[in-house]
Amino acid sequence: MDQSSEKELEKYINNRVQWDSLPSHAKSILDQSHVKYKQYCLKYSIKHQLRWDTNLISSFVTDERLYYQEIVRLSVANLVLYPYHIQDKLVPMLNVTPFKYYLIMMIETMTNSKSYDEIPNFTAVDCIRVLGIGRNQFIDLMNKFRSKGFLFKKKKDVIRGLLPTRSLEKNIEYWWILRYGYPNQDEERQGSLPASELEVLDDLKRSNGINGKQAGIYCRESVISLISKGLVYIDVPIQNQDTISVPPLEGFVMNRVLGDYFENLLYKIFVSIDERTTIQKLSEVLQINVELVKQACSLYCRLGFAKKKNLEPLLPQTPSPSSEGDTHSKWHHSWITYYQENETIIPQPILNNNNNNSNTIDNSNNNNNNNTNITSSSSSNTAINNSSQSSTLENNDNIVEGVVDESFNNGNEEQKRIGFVFDSSITAFLMMGNLGYGLKNHAVTMFERGKLSNEALADFLQELDKIDVEEFVDSEAKLYATNAISLRDTIRHLKNKYRIDDSNSSNSNSSSGGGSGNLQGLDLISCERMNQLDETTRIRVLKKNYSVLISMAPLSIDYCPVISSVPPNFGPAVYEVHSFWFRIYLYSMVGKGPNSILLPKGTRLKRIPTIFKDCEKILVCPIDHDPTTVNLSQLLPSVNETLLSSPVLLSAYTFIKYDTQPKLSKLMSHSRSNSIVSSSKDNQLLYHIPFPLDDLSADNGSPKKYTNIITNNTTTTTTTTTTTNTTNLNNNTIISEDQYNSDNIHTHPILYKIQSTFNLKNSFGYITLLKKETHILLNNNNNNNNKNNINNNKNNNNNNNNNNNNNNNNNNNNNNNNNNNNSITHQKVFEYLPLNVYYGIPIFDDKLNREVCAKIDKFNLLSKENLNRHSMDSRNLSLNLFNFISSTCPPIHPDLDSIDATKINSNLPSVQNIPFPTQIITFVNGNLDL
């Protein structure tokens, strides 16, 4: 059964369609078998833990108790989260509380000697909350278990004796609902429970138990004690109009991902949720049943990963002046005392600046308002930012950040933000770089949730400010620290500066991105998590929340970039731009680039291609991994292995070096030139130049002189003519060795050709040039005739020992051992070739990072007008690239001719499965050959 058929059957099951009402094509999927439909319905219902009484399964399984027992059995076996959404059935009917559920799961795991890493992420977090068993405790218990003898005991009995006997759940919120659990006469009989706990049980029984009451109206210690004894259980109510905020994750366990439906749902909502969007609106954007969204958000709050914003205040809003404030609170004083002792901020009534939502305080149980003593008061949906309640911030940057947050929160609820797209390389160096303990929670949030919201950036920046690069001695650690500083500067630059006006206002302000009004705010978005959403959902989420997307550069090839037409995206325009196709397209359009060969998947290299005979290292670019450099001696086995699973682009990277110094070997071996990138300016291999490029027409209007070395490569001994002339900038790439360096490389003519070809003046990023160093052979006696040359060479051979000290550096390279007839020397020749163009803001180079950010301000690239121009340029680039790919392999987009290039707000037919080449494509000496 294919995936589309499964989705169709699931739709009928969710809609409670009986067998007789199924359409004929659905019955044909099941081979006209009513039994198969029943089996599929049972399997789907248990897997998704559906309620028995409100779903189709009730018509196939008449025993409700047996159905829930099967859910528990399979859920424990598969290490699935406790099904809190059917807790009202599992506890009163089966007496299966979260504590008993996880106790059984832990016993089975330890009995079978499974690793702690096999417990899925969210399940492991809930085990810590209920059992108090984390990774270290699990290892300690396993060691104790192995050390104990169980000759006359069962393994499970030994393990049970090591595990806790009561629930350790203590992190309870006052607004959660307390419900009566499974009746236990032994525990409830007179004298075994304190009077305060008996009062709570009696009150819950009188209110029919299942309806429940808010935990905050009872003594906190009594509530926790009853939960630990299993006499009551907790429900976390979430309503359609609630808003949820997700602070940096604390206590998250990074184990394996289970991949079941609910875990996928949790991650999908994790990256999409924000505190400005109600639960109802979020379900509409994701097109997911609102009950499933409420289940996920309820679990977030239960695990401590999220906070509900529109809470009923713990303290009274207007206490009477003649009495103490807490005497007018409906909440038990123990909760107020607990928050005062353990929390920095007591939940307060929520202020509102939007008159349209003046009466939206959540009623935690709207259906049972009278029974649960839940009241509602007049307040708004927009919460006071926690940072505004803290003390004065430490520095001016943090003050600005506080102003940004305040201006954002007091503005329109639908204010859009800037989205900065990152990949897992950012989270890797934040977690593994030993940069500070405070950064780890933020890194885990960025990796697991896939987003770091604007509200959490102030604390994130404070942690980044603590990094001192000079403290790190190790070069790799210092590199991580430098990258973190670049990330900090980028966040601060984007967060505190830009206003992007979505309206048609013509006002522009170069210092603020061209818009007016409140500052945007900034969200950090993981491309991996965002791409886990299906395409239509991803487009809706991005369009709703963001005014512009900006990618880090370069994004890893291992992950697809976030593609978007609306909002405008300063990153790879389509997936193909993020692949080797764009490199080949760049070389063919500019007419310059390293000699390259694109090999289809399955090709076998039997010998090294002749265009690489003088190379030392080759750049290997698979379609789904980052490029790597390979020594020429290892090229064949390495590339042939990669070609088994992926097409490969091979490009010349470095060349064999000839030594021009005296008394040294002429040919430097591969092993002696492993280090291809040096800190020396003359030995620099790659140059990264930010764009847009500065206009050089203002330099007095006078042309510059360039020294070209014109070579003829048809023979081994090359005759050269050195000429100095005034030439056009666009025709000079081969230059003398001292012409360009890191200070003036930005004036190289090839850069301006690339910018004009791809309209880079409306975007930002950087161009990478490869410094090609080759050696040519010079004839030092080209002023004499051949006869004199031969005679001179004979005399040189006869008197070699007498003339060694008088020879210049070029004669030191003379091939005396082979008795050559000519005096030949090697001379270095440099050529600067485009390697790639990267869109976005670089993080790996602090200097380049500052230069790109300065370009954004200088050219006003985030203005409303430029956003439209950039969108048009990106669309044209995408269409041209599609046509180029289609000209080299079977077309993947047959409707390219029907696409209107002027409709910048419509999506292009890009696909994540980048097309594979079907033939060998070569780029040699500026010519593309198919």
UniProtKB/Swiss-Prot annotation:
Residues 352-392, 780-822 have a biased composition (Low complexity). Residues 349-397, 780-823 are annotated as: Disordered. InterPro entries: FAM91 (IPR039199), FAM91_C_dom (IPR028097), FAM91_N_dom (IPR028091). It holds the Pfam family FAM91_C. Disruption phenotype: No visible phenotype. Belongs to the FAM91 family. This is Protein FAM91 homolog.
